Structures are given as structure tokens and as C-alpha cells.
Amino acid sequence: MTWDDHKKNFARLARDGGYTIAQYAAEFNLNPNTARRYLRAFKEDTRTADSRKPNKPVRKPLKSMIIDHSNDQHAGDHIAAEIAEKQRVNAVVSAAVENAKRQNKRINDRSDDHDVINRAHRTLRDRLERDTLDDDGERFEFEAGDYLIDNVEARKAARAMLRRSGADVLETTLLEKSLSHLLMLENARDTCIRLVQEMRDQQKDDDEGTPPEYRIASMLNSCSAQISSLINTIYSIRNNYRKESREAEKHALSMGQAGIVKLAYERKRENNWSVLEAAEFIEAHGGKVPPLMLEQIKADLRAPKTNTDDEENQTASGAPSLEDLDKIARERAASRRADAALWIEHRREEIADIVDTGGYGDVDAEGISNEAWLEQDLDEDEEEDEEVTRKLYGDDD
């Protein structure tokens, strides 16, 4: 069909059923901008007298509405006049509404000499795709409202992610909706890019309008803003949930500490514990020792200690007895003697090792005998130390 044929066809459809340029372009698969440029001249005079919207009731000038009430017999005449005016206005409005209903009915009941756009129940993937004609010859219109349809696959993916992260019921619901919306938005973005690419391939050289690249850039900007908003929403939900979890843990910990302190005081009374033992019990169970108990422990540590286990062996001043001191002294002396004997034995072993390995004994370091040196006479100013010789070699030597 040429544009002249389109002009005649659009003029007839617009005159019979109130067709718009956008509906005509979508039905006949035309470029909306090009169709609007060629068919705009036929839009102004296509409406009939019945299809035009009724004019609003003209309000009378203020001077003509002034009523002389000098001859009114009753005060109710003013109210009756107002009621009559309201009834007249309501009648005009009712007539306009009825006229609009008749107009819509004529549009819906238009003649069947042209194709009608039909929409069938399809899956999300099919609804996001723009089909030309199916097997039955029906045309499916592509609308932006298809993106708002709930995506079952996106919901399942969101639930799987939330099960791995761990969340409560309220947070799960909010994050599930946000994540599914994010996944559907990404799916819609990819589908729009593919559709624009197909449109660019099908676009003719003489068609003018918005370039496909500009549409892709505009769509990507919108998707980026929406994705950033959804990410911020998910991040804020997670932060709020973690904050509430920390507050709940602090509250539970404070309540648990109160129970631990109460249990420690009960055990202290039952088992006759000291304050220090009660404090150890509280710390062992992860509690915090109360300030009063800390002050009592400090006071007990500052007080002088007295040993009253054996009062018979204690002096008047509380010092240990002489028998205890003598016993302690004997034990320390025996310990010192044992340490001295052990030290002497260790030193002898070190000296013997030095003599044997350094060549100062009967055999030098190379295994040669030192008898020649031992048989030499002493110098005039040297004397033999018999005591040392006896200790080293014995009496037989």
C-alpha cells in the first residue's frame, strides 16, 4: 500500500470508529513518526458531530444572575432557586456522560472490514517478544505493561538466593519482590535491545524518526537508574535487618546476664560461696560481674590475711611457731646441699671432657701419648700438689 492508500484507509477508519494514528500505525506495522507526519492532516476533520465531546454549560454573566429579592415572600425561595440550578447542572452533566458512553460504544462496535488486535494468554518470554503473525493469522501487540507481569522463574531464583543468605519472613518477602523485579528488569532490557536491533534491520532508508541507537541509550539510562534504585533498596533492607539482629542480640545478652547474676547469688547462699567464687561463676558463664560484687572483692583483697588453721602452734601475734621455722630451715639447707653436689658433679664432667678432648690428659687430641711430658721433672720453683693428684688419680697413682 502506498501512502495515498493509507491516507484514504485512515480517513475511513477514523471517521467510522474514531481511530488514532498510533493505533493505525501499530496495526499496519508502520513507523509511528512517519505515519504521524503523513496522516496528521486527516485527523482534524475525521470526527463526526456525534463523536465530538459536548461543550461545557456556559455560565451566565454575574450581572444577569443577580436576582431582586425585594418581593420574596419567604426565605425558602432562595433555597428553591439553588436546588433548581443544581438540578439543571446535573442534567447537563448526565447528558454529557450518556453521550460519551454512546461514543465509546460506537468505537467498540466499529465495522469488521479491518483487522482487530487480539491478545492471548502467553508466557512471560512470549509476552516480552513482539510477534508478527501466529499460525492463526492473529497479530499480537507489544505493550510496556508486559514487563509488570510476575515472573515465576525470577521468584524462584530470588528464593534460592535468600535461602543461602538466611533471613526472616518479612525480609524474605521484601527482598524476594526486589530481586524478582531486578531480574525482570534485566530481562526486559535485553529484550528491548533485541527488538530495537530487529527494528533497525527492518527500517527503510527513507524512514525518518528517532534513531534506534538513541532509543537504546535512553532505555539503558532508565534501566540503570531503576537497577541502582533496587540495589539501594536491597542494601538498606539488609542493613536494617542486621541492625535489628544486633539489637536483639544485645537485648538477649543483657537479659541473660541478669539471669546469670541471679543464679550466682542463689548458688552463693546455697553452697556458702565466697564473693570471689560467685564472681568466677558469673564470668565462667559469660556474664558481667556487678559493681557491688567487685567492690566487695576489692575490700577482701585489701584486708590482712590471718591463718587460723592450727591455733596451738600460733604465737600471740599470729606469726609461725619456732618448730615450723626450724622445719623450713632444714628443708632449705638440704635443698642447697643437693644443689651444690649436683653442681660439683656437673663441673667435674665438664673439666674431664675438656681434658680428654683438648689433649691435656694421658693422650692428646691426635691420640698420641703424653707420657713423655709426664716424666719430665719439675722446675726448681715448682712443687707437686699431692692432694690434687690424689683427687684426680687416686691413692694408687
From Swiss-Prot:
Residues 43-53, 388-397 have a biased composition (Basic and acidic residues). Disulfide bonds: none annotated. Keywords: DNA-binding, Hydrolase, Nuclease. Residues 374-387 have a biased composition (Acidic residues). GO terms for molecular function: DNA binding; nuclease activity. Residues 43-62, 304-325, 356-397 are annotated as: Disordered. It comes from the Viruses. Multimer of two distinct subunits. Necessary for recognition and cleavage of the phage packaging site (pac), together with the pacB protein. Both are probably the two major subunits of the phage PACase. This is Terminase A protein. It comes from Enterobacteria phage P7. The lineage of its organism: Viruses, Duplodnaviria, Heunggongvirae, Uroviricota, Caudoviricetes. The gene is pacA.
